[in-house]
């Protein structure tokens, strides 16, 4: 099972990646975010940076829905992400190989 350190290791190994200083992790390529910590928002409370959940760029709404419907134990979304090609990934439930695939795919789509 993965954690924030695994995300950092994978993202830092990719070409042309910039790490943004944050309370969690935040990685970009060509000024476009591809993986970052989930900023959980609860009405009436301060935002909480969740390093146990990664926000991943997935390219389009079709891919987002496929991931959400196909693997609900791994992926979820929140109302603030409606209309955005982003999913949240529960790091504790994903294995290292799948995490590497997801981070690399997100990077590739944003770098291209």
Predicted regions and their residues:
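Charge-dense, helix-prone N-terminal extensions
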Residues: 1-112
């Amino acid at each position: 099972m993965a954690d924030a350190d695994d995300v950092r290791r994978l993202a830092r190994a990719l070409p042309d990646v910039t790490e943004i200083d944050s309370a969690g992790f935040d990685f970009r390529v060509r000024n476009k975010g591809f993986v970052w910590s989930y900023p959980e928002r609860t009405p009436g409370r301060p935002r909480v940076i969740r390093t146990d959940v990664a926000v991943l760029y997935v390219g389009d709404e079709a891919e987002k829905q496929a991931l959400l419907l196909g693997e609900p134990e791994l992926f979820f979304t929140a109302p603030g992400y409606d209309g955005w090609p982003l999913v949240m990934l529960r790091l504790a439930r994903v294995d290292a190989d799948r995490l590497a695939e997801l981070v690399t795919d997100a990077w590739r789509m944003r770098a291209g």
